[in-house]
Amino acid sequence: MEKKISVVIPTYCRPLLLMECLKMLARQKFNREDFEVIVVSDGPDLITKQTVVSWKHTGLLDIEYIPLERKRGPAAARNMGWRMAAGTLIAFTDDDCLPDPLWLQTIWEAYQGEEMIAYSGRIIVPLPLRPTDYEWNIAQLEKARFVTANCVCTRKALGSIDGFDERFELAWREDSDLEFRLLQQGIPIQQLPEAIVVHPVREAGWGVSLREQKKSMFNALLYKKFPRLYRSYIRQQPNWSFYVMILCCGVFLAALLLEAGTLALTALGIWALLLGAFIWKRLAHTSHEWPHVTEIVLTSVLIPFLSVYWNLYGAVRYKVLYL
């Protein structure tokens, strides 16, 4: 049965978060018969299947569960979802998001029957007065121009660009890639600030900033595909301070071996100044409680090495000159 809107949600083994998202979709001020929800699990996931089945039995949502045969990432999950969807419009959100009750109604009222159009809604990230570094970074989604936590495309628009690029295997840069390909094809992206999705920050363990660095490899892929757009909208130049910090560490060790004390102290001093600036930047808008400060200091020592490693790994993997 054809629908006005299909909501596609990628997920994997996060039933409690998914449950809250589905509760908000069940509260939509939009005719229940006019939209469907497609939950796509990034790999076999019995507990997610049971969650979706329980919702289906309530009759509060027209909802389907689709599992990928193996873990392939959210881009692949979204592709599976929209290709199985019956909606004229495909709305994307995430399992840790809470769509506003007027979300779908706002989207449909903005749609004028165009075959090729996309919409970008507004993201709200609730924060405590002094957030952690991780919380502050997530809050930058509020400034993003186009994110998959709250975006909509017509089926024809998605089909014209073949959906998401599944080489983006983690939740990183696949939304910018979709945006850039829409722009490349001349498909308009309309800002829709009245279409609101709240994105609470989920709990993260100690040192999450270290694990996040792996995503940097996909910067190289996006840069290879869209060098001009990448430099215009993502990052104008490499993070040279990280490279200088690593160089200083190498010079310091070499100077110690050569017993060049002045050179060693100079390299150590430059490294310490750059490290201090990096720590200051991360603490400028975040919590100053000692456990958080300790985490910031320790992870700031390691982040430059991990960031450069994963950026260069991506450059080699995707065969592009990228720093």
Model-derived segments and their meaning:
Residues 1-27:
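N-proximal low-complexity "stem/linker" segments adjacent to membrane-targeting elements
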Residues 3-6, 36, 41, 177:
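Cell-envelope/extracellular polymer assembly enzymes that use nucleotide-activated donors
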Residues 23-67:
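Acidic donor-binding segment of Leloir-type glycosyltransferases
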Residues 68-85, 145-149:
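Glycine-rich, basic loop-to-helix element that forms the pyrophosphate-binding segment
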Residues 90:
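Short aromatic/hydrophobic "clamp" motif used to bind/position activated sugar donors
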Residues 98-131, 200:
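Conserved donor NDP-sugar-binding/catalytic core segment of glycosyltransferases
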Residues 170, 176-231:
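Catalytic donor/gating beta->alpha subdomain of glycosyltransferases that bind UDP-sugars
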Residues 245-318:
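Membrane-embedded multi-pass helical conduit in multi-pass membrane proteins
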